[in-house]
Amino acid sequence: MTGSTPEGARTEQEAARWVRGMFGRVAHRYDLANHLLSFNIDRYWRARTVRRTEKILERPEARVLDICCGTGDLVLALAKRGHAVLGSDFCHPMLVAAHSKIARRRAPAVLFESDALTLPLRDASLDLITVAFGFRNLANYQSGLVEMRRVLRPGGMAAILEFTQPPNAAFATLYNLYACRILPWIGGLISGSRDAYTYLPESVRKFPAAPELAGMMRGAGFSDVTFEYLTGGIVALHLGRII
């Protein structure tokens, strides 16, 4: 398997089914858990993603899609620039939460239910595709990159914001102590599902390191691939262009 590997999943289909069910169980408390467990720094990470994609967002007719959009936080951040942003996710309860937030804020956004590996979009139809903390959960990372590449126009950009292993060994040890011992306990109390927050650090441990993910993006056809570590390297933001 070349993607997310939840315990007990033997195929990509089983992995996707497990991830969909897990997010469905925590959707009602997902935002609260995220903000508390990240000490609200997740808002900064998304804002940084928007800033790094500004040149695309400044285009008057830019078409923008956030895949694995969850409860819509990055969709809302992107929509603040005035664009009608698309958001997709394959977990229905997460989309229900996103719809509610978008309606309350009257944001220019349209959501649809779809697996990120099989987007119902034409080739070369987008200028920007983003994903925040969802790429790691895909059942096949290479297929996800190829699909992102397929729907981008020449001159378009992909932005992947994802947890990663900190490059500093000492800091990584401290972070892993928090992620493996404290985070599952608190996340379980908040969300009612400890499984989701036990899966999180394990999935980060198995996820390709930032330099490896950059190489995978190049292999999928992206050019000018760069990445930056944020907050001591617990998160990395990857950018890649289509020439």
Indicate where each model-derived feature is located.
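Conserved alpha-helix/loop element of class I SAM-dependent methyltransferases that forms part
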Residues: 29, 39-61
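N-terminal, positively charged/glycine-rich alpha-helical extensions of SAM-dependent methyltransferases
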Residues: 1-31, 179, 190
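Core SAM-dependent methyltransferase catalytic element
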Residues: 223-243
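A short glycine-rich, Lys/Arg-flanked "PGG" loop and its adjoining helix->strand segment in the class I
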Residues: 142-157
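C-terminal alpha-helical "lid/dimerization" subdomain adjacent to the S-adenosyl-L-methionine
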Residues: 164-216, 220, 226
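Hydrophobic beta-strand segment of the Class I
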Residues: 30, 129-130
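Class I SAM-dependent methyltransferase SAM/SAH-binding core
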Residues: 63-118
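A short acidic, Gly/Pro-enriched loop at the edge of an enzyme's catalytic core
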Residues: 117-128
